Amino acid sequence: MTAPEQPVKQEEMAALDVDSSGHGEYLQHGNGNASASAAAAAPQDAQPSPLALLAATCSKIGPPSPEEDEAAAAAASHSAGATGDLASVQLAGTPNRWEVLSAAPATIKDEAGNIVQIPGAATVTSSGQYVLPIQSLQNQQIFSVAPGSDSSNGTVSNVQYQVIPQIQTADGQQVQLGFAASSDNSSINQETGQIQIIPGSNQTIIASGSPSANIQNILSQSGQVQVQGVAIGGSSFPGQAQVVANVPLGLPGNITFVPINSVDLDSLGLGSGSQTMTAGINADGHLINTGQAMDSSDNSERTGEQVSPEITETATDNDLFVPTSSSSQLPVTIDSSSILEQNANNLTTTSGQVHSSDLQGNYIQTSVSDDTQAQNIQVSTAQPIVQHIQLQESQQPTSQAQIVQGIAQQTIHGVQASQSISPQALQNLQLQLNPGTFLIQAQTVTPSGQITWQTFQVQGVQNLQNLQIQNAPGQQITLTPVQTLTLGQVAAGGALTSTPVSLSTAQLPNLQTVTVNSIDSAGIQLHQGENAGSPADIRIKEEEPDPEEWQLSGDSTLNTNDLTHLRVQVVDEEGDQPHQEGKRLRRVACTCPNCKEGGGRGSNLGKKKQHICHIPGCGKVYGKTSHLRAHLRWHSGERPFVCNWMFCGKRFTRSDELQRHRRTHTGEKKFVCPECSKRFMRSDHLAKHIKTHQNKKGIHSSSTVLASVEATSDDTLITAGGTTLILANIQQGSVSGIGTVNTSGTSNQDILTNTEIPLQLVTVSGNETME
């Protein structure tokens, strides 16, 4: 690492004074730690002669007086215009021995044949090198003159000086370098052999003294400073130089650091009633909550209070989360080989790359080796990594918040703080790092839900000063807690009761809280029927959009033994409106063309009224208007009756078809056989089943008893031809279904005239007849 050759003026090259410091003999250390000194040859002048001045100076036994030194320097400075060749004066140490240098002057001849007079303080070693005492080279620049150089033309070849590289940061700022100082504040340390390089005019180098607390933004490198490949006087000192420089790391979100020597919490005016968060770090390096959740009653009284975090350590954990929000900034001590992690689980960032041009003066001081060409430190998150950290609250208060940090030897370095810290009080963070290598890991969550870790490695950092964390003003965390949720529960008696469930809400500082009102009891509702004692009268109301209520009738599930003293009323089930108790269906005049033209009757006036379909080619005849209307809907394709069962949606032209279809969903079998108690969904299926019993017993039609009950205006007469309801006499004798009745002297006419006969229901249908 040499600088380019620069011309040296003759008036700037003065003769070096010899300072013997009161000694006539000098020691040269040569055990490998010998420090290199420099020598310069003064240009010769004819008037007065510099050799005469040197001979007069060296003839004295003691050190030269200050007056003589000044005279010699003045004489050398006025010797402009004279020409002379400088010999190859080289500085080197003889290894593994001490040499005694005599103070007598010497005159030797170099390789070019020039006569050079050596001062009394210097000597010639066995290798033919000139050695000058180190006391005479204080506060002088070190350079060497190669053999055969000519100073008359104003140039000096192979001048090597200032081996510190010129390093600048990304924004053009000057690099600040620091080196460990020698013990005696001299240019060369005799004990450690360190070479102290004199800085140039455009560099700022702290060359001596321990790192002072008054010097800001300076990083001191401990240990020996070795210059690699520096040639001084023909000798080389190989080694690797640790150059400490300011390298921009690229902390996003305008994050800077400012040092804090001590945190005086008493002068910050902190309150005594603040909440305390108790958190811990598990073995995986995640922040966990070790306290219990606070209920809503305590949160209402502690509105506006601050949160003080407390981070504890597990037995096997060497990782540390450094809190970065304004309410959790405390001094932290980080050991070498420890991992500094940022918990950003609550943030979603977009992967990207931050270039050096986007950095805004945020630096972390690192050490870069000479053998390392370039170290690109990249941050793969375009958005700020640290903005707001979600904190868990704990109900248990603590008097002190302590941050501890785990080390491989299970040694704990802790920094104590007082009982609470407000976010307005602490705005700074101090990171004290021991020498070594440490990692910075930032955890981010991608939009797809994957957790990624970004790792940054920094080597050789001993101390970080002038660092300040400033939180980004955007992206406040919004909490939407549910304060009270009312759940509906069904009691044993069927009543719906509301049970409020209280949920705790976290009152965190600087967070907007959105309150959700209480939810009323809705969803499942049980509607009680008129007769609460009968489970068959319970109506189940389905959720929207199904507004129709289903009623499970009790007579559809009763056995035949429960049908004694039953009054049977046959109604028109084909009507458009369902039957409601206490209301009668009004008959509507038929509006078909045949009924209007024929005056409402068929061709035969004495017979029952008939309704003939007026569609050409059909000609079907119906005895009821409802049947004709249903038939006309079949012609037009209109199907107004829709099954509202889930995922069904079938449509029908007649209501009885819809009711029959519903029984396929519910599995209801309302038609019961009186012989074997089998159940059927349809009445025609039951009629066919009854015929099987009749055929087995050989029942003839003459032994069948048909009866009618109370032939009133509201009841329909039941006859033997094409009737819809079959009644059997069960008063006298034993009757099994429709069978032979043993009346013991009672005629069939007497049975028919008896109006108090208990009846047994065999089949119920308004429009279906038995075959």
Curated annotation (Swiss-Prot):
Gene Ontology CC terms, in alphabetical order: cytosol; PML body; transcription repressor complex
Localization of this protein: Nucleus; Nucleus, PML body
Keyword Nucleus assigned: yes
Residue stretches of biased makeup (Low complexity): 34-47
Cross-link (Glycyl lysine isopeptide (Lys-Gly) (interchain with G-Cter in SUMO)) at residue(s): K109, K541
GO function terms (MF aspect): chromatin binding; DNA-binding transcription factor activity, RNA polymerase II-specific; DNA-binding transcription repressor activity, RNA polymerase II-specific; RNA polymerase II cis-regulatory region sequence-specific DNA binding; RNA polymerase II-specific DNA-binding transcription factor binding; zinc ion binding
Zinc finger (C2H2-type): 611-635, 641-665, 671-693
Chain spans, region Transactivation domain (Gln-rich): 129-228, 341-489
A Pfam family reported for this protein in Swiss-Prot or TrEMBL: zf-C2H2
Annotated GO biological process: B cell differentiation; definitive hemopoiesis; embryonic camera-type eye morphogenesis; embryonic skeletal system development; enucleate erythrocyte differentiation; granulocyte differentiation; liver development; lung development
Region of interest (Disordered), residue spans: 1-47, 60-79
Free-text comment on this protein's domains from its UniProt entry: The 9aaTAD motif is a transactivation domain present in a large number of yeast and animal transcription factors.
Family label: Belongs to the Sp1 C2H2-type zinc-finger protein family.
Cited PANTHER family: KRUEPPEL-LIKE TRANSCRIPTION FACTOR (PTHR23235), TRANSCRIPTION FACTOR SP3 (PTHR23235:SF3)
Name of the protein this chain belongs to: Transcription factor Sp3
Gene this protein is translated from: SP3
